[in-house]
């Protein structure tokens, strides 16, 4: 299977700290590199993380608050400076078109890259040319319009060695069966369905600034990896509700209810000196893998089910 991992470029919320840069997350998915919410300093964090401008194939903004988009000018200019040969697709709330245009034209530079824009007018599937996954936008609840993203690989099949062997299908003939869909064996036709079982594709959800709402659960449902904001702790839930954010406990309860496999917490308020309580709060409610994100960490997607 191709490399699939999350490269964490920044984990702060509104105010960066000495240890935490503003947001930035690159999802590597084979030849795809989806850059989510590049905040200030993302370009420099890419250098530290070993991420090249040519790795970026798509940019996805959840909303137009500065900590989620002020790195966009540098990214757009860098992909042009480095003469990235492939088109780059950009997704963002259509209501922020004015901000997007300003960010992409923040200063003079030579435009060499085909930046294909996909403003999101409402929830639903998005155009993802040549992608090995579908992309869906789901509305969230924040003081400005915000969307979360869900990426889903199409379902496939898993060949069953025991059934293949029982029918005398070995070596190159297995590939022939997979390509053709059926194969003549000892005078009868064997189909792929007879020697395989369904294999669900991998899935990934990205949930940033939002209070609890139906969209959070919709995005999280059954995903292999959920990257979700945990700005506050449950003790400060009143602040989370007031400002349109989540607590670590809320994020963990969502993950538990949704049968998530790997929970990645991020977007932490600068009010907390350590994140030990975030982990403890999450593990109290969620028994799966909990990752408290750190800048420059690489988090592999869990193996296929």
UniProtKB/Swiss-Prot annotation:
Record bears the keyword Secreted: no
Active site per database record: 67
Single GO term (MF): zinc ion binding
Top-level EC class as recorded in UniProt: hydrolase
Pfam families: Lactamase_B (PF00753), Lactamase_B_2 (PF12706)
Keyword rRNA-binding: no
Keywords, alphabetical: Endonuclease, Hydrolase, Metal-binding, Nuclease, tRNA processing, Zinc
Cofactor binding comment, as recorded: Binds 2 Zn(2+) ions.
EC number annotated for this UniProt entry: 3.1.26.11
Gene3D superfamilies: Ribonuclease Z/Hydroxyacylglutathione hydrolase-like
Recorded family membership: Belongs to the RNase Z family.
Subunit-structure text: Homodimer.
UniProt function note: Zinc phosphodiesterase, which displays some tRNA 3'-processing endonuclease activity. Probably involved in tRNA maturation, by removing a 3'-trailer from precursor tRNA.
PANTHER family associated with the record: ZINC PHOSPHODIESTERASE ELAC PROTEIN 1
Protein name, per record: Ribonuclease Z
Name of the gene this protein is made from: rnz
């Amino acid at each position: 299977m191709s490399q699939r991992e999350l490269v964490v470029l920044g984990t702060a919320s509104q105010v960066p700290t000495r240890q935490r840069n503003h947001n930035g997350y690159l999802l590597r998915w084979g030849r795809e590199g989806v850059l989510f919410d590049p905040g200030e300093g993302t370009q420099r964090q890419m250098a530290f993380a070993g991420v090249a401008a040519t790795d970026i194939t798509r940019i996805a903004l959840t909303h137009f608050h500065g900590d989620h988009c002020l790195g966009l000018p540098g990214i757009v200019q860098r992909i042009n400076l480095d003469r990235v040969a492939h088109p780059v697709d950009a997704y963002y709330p259509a209501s922020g078109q004015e901000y997007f245009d300003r960010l992409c034209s923040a200063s003079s530079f030579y435009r060499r890259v085909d930046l294909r824009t996909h403003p999101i007018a409402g929830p639903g599937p998005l155009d993802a040319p040549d992608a090995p996954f579908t992309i869906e936008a789901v509305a969230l609840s924040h003081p400005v319009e915000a969307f979360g993203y869900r990426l889903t690989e199409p379902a496939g099949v898993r060949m069953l060695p025991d059934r293949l062997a029982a029918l005398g299908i070995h070596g190159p003939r297995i590939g022939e069966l997979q390509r053709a869909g059926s194969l003549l064996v000892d005078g009868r036709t064997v189909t792929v369905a007879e020697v395989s079982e369904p294999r669900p594709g991998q899935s990934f959800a990205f949930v940033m600034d939002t209070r609890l709402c139906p969209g959070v659960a919709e995005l999280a449902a059954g995903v292999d990896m959920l990257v979700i904001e945990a700005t506050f702790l449950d003790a400060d839930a009143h602040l989370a509700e007031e400002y349109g954010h989540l607590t670590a406990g809320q994020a963990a309860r969502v993950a538990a209810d949704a049968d998530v496999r790997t929970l990645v917490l991020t977007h932490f308020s600068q009010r907390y000196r350590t994140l030990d309580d975030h982990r403890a709060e999450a593990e109290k409610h969620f028994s799966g893998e909990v990752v408290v994100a750190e800048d420059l960490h690489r988090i592999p997607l869990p193996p296929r089910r």
